[in-house]
Every structure is written in structure tokens, then in C-alpha cells.
């Protein structure tokens, strides 16, 4: 004989569910907005209309531009975030996020105007998120662009507790007549290399594999700081010194050295038939890259196509302008070297070779 189904517990059914019960804390989101407003406020610049919190962010292109062309870029920080989780170090990845996009749009001559961020997590930790956004705001200050908006997505079940993902979006402007596209690069031009601050934000899947193999003490001293701090050093932002250089020197082309290293990024600004011949003796290989190569048994060719190997930005100028450009960049605090020359390609030759 079938037993009658039990009636729902009247106490359970009377108690309604809330968004918090589902894992989304609206109050935490509001607290984060309040916490980050002072950071965003410090990035405000001419062109910003309104503040944080609206449905859309408004920006007026500065009147100094006669024929402005908008240049946009988007990027993330990649698996460097996994190392940040492991080390519980969240104060520098925000600068990484900004750098990856503003350095990209800079190579076409664009001045970064504004930036937006996307922070996604499973459970929002206000302290961690605020630390990340503070770093984003600092990166915007270094770039001269405004942090005018963003999105914080708390999505239960999508990410493990304590983990998050980031995406950033930069928009800049350049005069139409001053777009840098590499079309004027010619044989005899010089390739200048601007020093990186470390690994930047590419190659971290290999970095993590090397760490797994070598099992180093990440807190041990490494070249004057902990190995952890050396690995997590934030991506250098080249915006202000290079915008100043463009006012005084005819910059023919630039390449942000990201995934693919020198050998895959410099060709992106070279027309067919040209090769950048780089001399590996032209700049010092930083100790961190030597450490990675040694402990990972990484071949030279693989190093050059995965890591920046100490060069975060390549700049192409005429031979006549090279010394002046080095002087201006050095005066602005950059380390810079002549790392190569442009020549005609041999038959079947790659567009960037390291000798």
C-alpha cells in the first residue's frame, strides 16, 4: 500500500530565499563600489563627464584633437593570476591589467584616454577586490587615463573561492595624420629596446611549470628581493615617456613585446620584405630569465618566442635619430639599448632573427 507523500515542512516553505542564499552578496558589491571610488577619483582627467556608478561612462574627446581616431584594446593577465592566488598577492595584478592594454594601443601612437575593468569571481571578497582595483587605478595614473567604469560579477559556482579573473579595456586617441603603422620603416633603421620590469604578463604557464619542477623557496632572496616579488613584478607602462618621445622624434614603428616574444611581435609592424636583425649581445639578459632558462632547460629559441627576455617595448627610428631618442628616453628614466637594425629579408627568412 502506497504511503501518502509527506507535506512540505511549513517552516521551510514559509522562509523565502534571498540572493545572498544563492551566493550573491549585494551588500558586498555596494561596499566594494564605495571602497574603490577614491581610487577612481584620483584618475580623473579632462574629458570625463560624470563619475562611477552610472549605466554608462561618458567621455568627451579632448578638443586638442583635430581629426581624432579612436584606438581600442582589451586584454587580461593570463595565468599570472594563478601565482597571485598561490602567493596571496593581489596588489600588482591591477597594474598588469592596465599595462597590457595601454601599451598595446600606444604602439599606434595613441594617447590612452580611459579604461574599464571586469572583475569576475565566485564569491566576492571586498578586501581582495579593492586591492586589485587600487592597482588598476594606479596603472591608470601611470598611463594618464581615467578609470571611468567597470563590472564586478559575483557568480557562485563559476570560480573556486579565493579565485577571480580579470579583463581590461582601454580606449585612446591619435591624430589621423599621426597614426604609427610601420609603413615608413626602411632598411638601415635602428631597433631600440626599452627594458622590461620583469616577466610582465606573458609566459606564466611555462613559469609555473618551471616552478613546479624546480621547487624553489619563493621567499628566498633573489637579486635584492624575494623570488616571489621578482616573478610578480608588475608590467612596466611605457605611455608617458613614449608619448613625449613622439613629440620630438619621428617614431616609425613600435612593438609591445608580449606573448610570442621579440621574434613574433616585431614582425607585426614590419612590411613584407623587411627583417629586424637583433643582436643578443646588444642588451643584458636579466638574472630572472637566466634562472628560468637554467631551471627549465629552455632552449634559446624558445626563450625568445615565449618571454620578453628583458625588452618590453621595441621602437624603430631612423639611424640619424637613434642617439637622440636614446638620450630622451634615458632622461625620462627608461633603460634603452640599440638592439638591432632593419634590413631587406633574404629569401624565405623570418621577419625577426636573433643572432
UniProtKB/Swiss-Prot annotation:
Q: Which domain of life is it from?
A: Bacteria
Q: Which UniProt keywords apply?
A: ATP-binding, Cytoplasm, Ligase, Nucleotide-binding, Purine biosynthesis
The listed locations are: Cytoplasm
A single MF term (Gene Ontology):
phosphoribosylformylglycinamidine cyclo-ligase activity
| Catalyzed chemical reaction(s) | 2-formamido-N(1)-(5-O-phospho-beta-D-ribosyl)acetamidine + ATP = 5-amino-1-(5-phospho-beta-D-ribosyl)imidazole + ADP + phosphate + H(+)
| Pathway assignment | Purine metabolism; IMP biosynthesis via de novo pathway; 5-amino-1-(5-phospho-D-ribosyl)imidazole from N(2)-formyl-N(1)-(5-phospho-D-ribosyl)glycinamide: step 2/2
Q: Could you say which enzyme class this protein belongs to?
A: ligase
Task: Report the main location listed first in the record.
Answer: cytoplasm
**InterPro entries cross-referenced by the UniProt entry:** PurM-like_C_dom, PurM-like_C_sf, PurM-like_N, PurM-like_N_sf, PurM_cligase
What's an example Gene Ontology biological process for this entry? Answer: adenine biosynthetic process
Q: Which GO terms describe its cellular component?
A: cytosol
Which Enzyme Commission numbers does its entry carry?
6.3.3.1
**Family from the record:** Belongs to the AIR synthase family.
Tell me what this protein is called: Phosphoribosylformylglycinamidine cyclo-ligase
Amino acid at each position: 500500500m502506497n504511503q501518502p507523500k509527506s507535506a512540505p515542512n511549513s517552516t521551510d516553505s514559509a522562509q523565502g530565499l534571498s540572493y545572498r542564499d544563492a551566493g550573491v552578496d549585494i551588500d558586498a558589491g555596494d561596499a566594494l563600489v564605495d571602497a574603490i571610488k577614491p581610487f577612481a577619483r584620483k584618475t580623473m582627467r579632462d574629458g570625463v563627464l560624470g563619475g562611477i556608478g552610472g549605466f554608462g561612462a561618458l567621455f568627451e574627446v579632448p578638443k586638442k584633437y583635430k581629426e581624432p581616431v579612436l584606438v581600442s584594446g582589451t586584454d587580461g593577465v593570463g595565468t599570472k593570476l594563478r601565482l597571485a592566488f598561490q602567493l596571496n598577492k593581489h596588489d600588482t595584478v591591477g597594474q598588469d591589467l592596465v599595462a597590457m592594454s595601454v601599451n598595446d594601443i600606444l604602439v599606434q601612437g595613441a594617447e590612452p584616454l580611459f579604461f574599464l575593468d571586469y572583475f569576475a569571481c565566485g564569491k566576492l571578497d571586498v578586501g581582495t577586490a579593492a586591492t586589485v582595483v587600487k592597482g588598476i587605478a594606479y596603472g591608470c595614473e601611470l598611463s594618464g587615463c581615467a578609470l571611468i567604469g567597470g563590472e564586478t560579477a559575483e557568480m557562485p559556482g563559476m570560480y573556486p573561492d579565493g579565485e577571480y579573473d580579470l579583463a581590461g579595456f582601454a580606449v585612446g586617441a591619435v591624430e589621423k595624420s599621426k597614426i604609427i603603422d610601420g609603413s615608413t620603416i626602411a632598411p638601415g633603421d635602428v631597433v631600440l629596446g626599452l627594458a622590461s620590469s620583469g616577466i610582465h604578463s606573458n609566459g606564466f604557464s611555462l613559469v609555473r611549470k618551471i616552478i613546479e619542477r624546480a621547487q624553489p623557496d619563493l621567499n628566498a632572496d633573489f637579486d635584492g628581493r624575494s623570488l616571489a616579488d621578482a616573478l610578480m613584478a608588475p608590467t612596466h607602462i611605457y605611455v608617458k615617456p613614449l608619448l613625449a618621445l613622439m613629440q620630438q622624434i619621428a617614431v616609425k614603428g613600435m612593438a609591445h613585446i608580449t606573448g610570442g616574444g621579440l621574434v613574433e611581435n616585431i614582425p607585426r609592424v614590419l612590411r613584407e620584405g623587411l627583417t629586424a636583425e637583433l643582436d643578443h649581445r646588444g642588451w643584458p639578459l636579466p638574472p630572472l630569465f637566466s634562472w628560468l632558462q637554467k631551471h627549465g632547460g629552455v632552449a634559446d629559441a624558445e626563450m625568445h618566442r615565449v618571454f620578453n627576455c628583458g625588452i618590453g617595448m621595441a621602437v624603430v627610428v631612423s639611424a640619424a635619430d637613434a642617439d637622440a631618442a636614446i638620450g630622451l628616453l634615458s632622461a625620462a628614466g627608461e633603460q634603452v639599448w640599440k638592439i638591432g637594425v632593419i634590413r631587406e629579408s633574404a629569401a624565405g627568412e623570418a621577419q625577426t632573427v636573433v643572432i
